[in-house]
């Protein structure tokens, strides 16, 4: 399936797992809530999907890349405790709380959200000492002797063996306890996301002309050459910033993100043409309604890729203006709602309290900032990347 369908399925699963019956108990008992296992090549957006699902479902998110952990941080540190069993005292080994479990409780405390998603990435690439712990985690939803809190949905992700030499295959016993989703790169689906995320229009128009260059992983005698969706998105962010600073991105820089020499060379040449068309056609003048007659004459004779580039430039310019307008409207609406609530509160304030209005207004601001920060900690605030002026 593609990443969009996977996102929808995860979102539906979270809602189903967190649904409660008339007695306030989870409709699907925790023991029947199978963890979701996403399997797919690197860089296709698995982590971003989890952030979107958590935000849209209004739950917290704790994400870990498990290859960054040791058995001690995942399970906890051992310590000796004295116990009385039968008729004698004995020393037994217990463990401190898992760092991962502790981070869930810390997230709950920081955000005020008791339900959430625990996302474990690269779960099938762990070290030999941690592999049994991950199997226990998927099968029993525990780290050591500590269970994942109720109300937390487990989602794990891994890479197929052809993309990672460290991959460990799961046995049938484990696979029979998870919901496996195999994800494949899908350019049309990614373009929907890219437009919403304001991916640089040069990248979008280039991939429109060369869809085969969206995602490739090739191995030869010179090593592995690859380009991923993550690489295109990160390059887009850099191009935006470079344009703002008046800097030029060359092929060497592009190779740092697009680690496929032929594709990097091809895109670098396209990007040079893209900027040339922007200057030659005077995109800002066109958007201002001051297009020169020569522009129309040239456009009639232009090849298809040149016309497509110009359309992308114009759409990027319009996108910048539309987004700025939407952001201004959102700020105005938020200010209006805040002032309306403040006015209601002022109406209930006794008149004989000196400086009461100023104190109330100050407290309203503090409460608003605290609420906003709590939502930010819970990743419930949608912060769409601001598009730069690419025209």
Where are these regions (language model features)?
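General alpha-helical segment detector with a strong preference for membrane-spanning helices
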Residues: 163, 232-234, 390
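AAA+ P-loop NTPase catalytic core and its hallmark functional loops
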Residues: 1-205
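Long intrinsically disordered, low-complexity regions that are acidic and Ser/Thr-rich
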Residues: 346-377
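Alpha-helical lid/collar subdomain of P-loop NTPases
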Residues: 196-344
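Conserved small/polar residues in nucleotide/adenosyl-binding loops
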Residues: 382-391
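Alpha-helical transmembrane segments and their juxtamembrane interfaces
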Residues: 131-132, 238, 377
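Active-site catalytic microenvironments for nucleophilic, acid-base chemistry
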Residues: 56, 140, 238-241, 386
């Amino acid at each position: 399936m593609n990443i969009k369908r996977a996102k929808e399925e995860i979102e539906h699963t979270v809602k189903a797992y967190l649904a409660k019956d008339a007695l306030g108990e989870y409709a699907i008992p925790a023991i029947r809530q199978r963890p979701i296992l996403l399997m797919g090549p690197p860089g296709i957006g698995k982590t971003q999907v989890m952030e979107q699902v958590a935000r849209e479902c209004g739950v917290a998110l704790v994400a870990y890349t498990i290859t960054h952990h040791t058995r001690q941080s995942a399970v906890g540190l051992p310590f000796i405790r004295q116990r009385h069993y039968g008729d004698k005292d004995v020393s037994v080994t217990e463990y401190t709380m898992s760092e991962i479990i502790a981070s869930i409780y810390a997230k709950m405390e920081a955000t005020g959200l008791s339900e959430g998603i625990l996302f474990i990435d690269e779960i099938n690439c762990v070290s030999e000492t941690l592999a049994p712990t991950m199997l226990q985690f998927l099968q029993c939803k525990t780290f050591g002797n500590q269970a994942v809190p109720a109300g937390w949905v487990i989602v794990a992700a891994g890479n197929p063996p052809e993309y990672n030499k460290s991959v460990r295959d799961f046995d049938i016993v484990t696979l029979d306890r998870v919901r496996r989703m195999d994800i494949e790169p899908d350019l049309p689906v990614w373009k929907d996301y890219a437009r919403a995320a304001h991916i640089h229009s040069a990248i979008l128009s280039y991939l429109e002309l060369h869809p085969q260059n969206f995602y490739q992983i090739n191995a030869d005698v010179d090593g592995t050459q690859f380009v991923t969706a993550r690489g295109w998105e990160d390059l887009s962010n850099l191009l935006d910033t470079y344009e703002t600073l008046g800097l030029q991105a060359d092929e060497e820089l592009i190779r740092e993100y697009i680690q496929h020499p032929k594709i990097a060379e091809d895109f670098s040449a396209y990007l040079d043409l893209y900027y040339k068309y922007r200057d030659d056609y005077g995109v800002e003048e066109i958007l201002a309604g001051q297009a020169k007659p020569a522009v129309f004459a040239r456009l009639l004779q232009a090849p298809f890729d040149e016309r497509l580039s110009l359309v992308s430039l114009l759409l990027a310019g319009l996108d910048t203006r539309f987004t700025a307008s939407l952001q201004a409207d959102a700020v105005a609406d938020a200010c209006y709602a805040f002032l309306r609530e403040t006015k209601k509160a002022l109406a209930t304030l006794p008149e004989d309290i000196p400086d009461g209005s100023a104190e109330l207004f100050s407290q309203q601001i503090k409460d608003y900032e605290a609420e906003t920060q709590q939502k930010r900690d819970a990743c419930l605030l949608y912060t769409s990347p601001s598009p730069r002026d690419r025209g």
